[in-house]
Amino acid sequence: LIASNKSPLIIGHRGASAVAPENTLAAFARAFRDGADGIELDVRLARDGVPVVIHDTTVPRTRLRKRRVARTRSDKLQQIDIGSWFNRAYRGLARLEYTRQTIPTLDDVFRLLANQPSKELIVYVELKAGRARKKNDELAAAVVELVARHQLQRRVVVISFNLRAVATIKELDSSIRTGALFGPRQRAVKSTRQIIAAAIASGADEVLLHHRIATKRIIDAAHELRLVIAVWTVDDPRWLARARSLQISAILTNHPAKMLA
């Protein structure tokens, strides 16, 4: 993991998404203000090849909810209000600034990171890779180019469920840290040995486990091969003691402030 004496690191999952609209600059800034050690976000390619920060293939919770990200230019995506839904859904947390939130580019997020006082904050960038190898390679190349442009090789971890995409990142720039994502769906069909072998084969530095499958057995197996372990998505502070006992290096959470209280 990025050099740190703190364990576990607290990472804002899609920003401080429990208290701000997910994957927005407001959510990322809130996570930093709340004391998070970093943020996690999702990236896809817009029609013009620009990496934009959004989880779904379409734009949910907006009047343009059927618009496909891959078929829309980034400048058009940056005009779409993706914050107002949060104010309507969570009136007690509503803020005027959320009505001005639009889909950010990955470049926007890296610029926000550069403006933070701490130069140790990190970003987990999840590649939302599909089945098309060519498109996945284009996404990986675009992310690597941005990481290099902002000189963030030591502060970014590129992660994905698509382990071919993880391997591509390492092929393009071996200095960028990578992580292999595994959830209950993968655990249902893979043994501990198969999960660890798949992570190693991808060249990953880290294994990111859904909290339901983060057992001592699999964590110990990963540590034996010097793989760093992160767990997602945990909003219960009682998990911190377990994380420390299992030597988990990072926790992805929707609510950094709650985990740090």
Name every feature range the model reports, one short phrase each.
Residues 1-12:
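N-terminal amphipathic alpha-helix/helix-capping segment at the start of soluble metabolic enzymes
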Residues 25, 29, 33, 103-114, ...:
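Amphipathic, non-transmembrane alpha-helical secondary structure
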Residues 30-45, 199-207:
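Catalytic domains of carbohydrate-active enzymes, especially glycoside hydrolases
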Residues 55-186, 202-205, 209-211, 223-225:
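Metal-dependent phosphodiesterase/phospholipase catalytic core, i.e.
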Residues 180-261:
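C-terminal active-site rim and adjoining tail of enzyme catalytic domains
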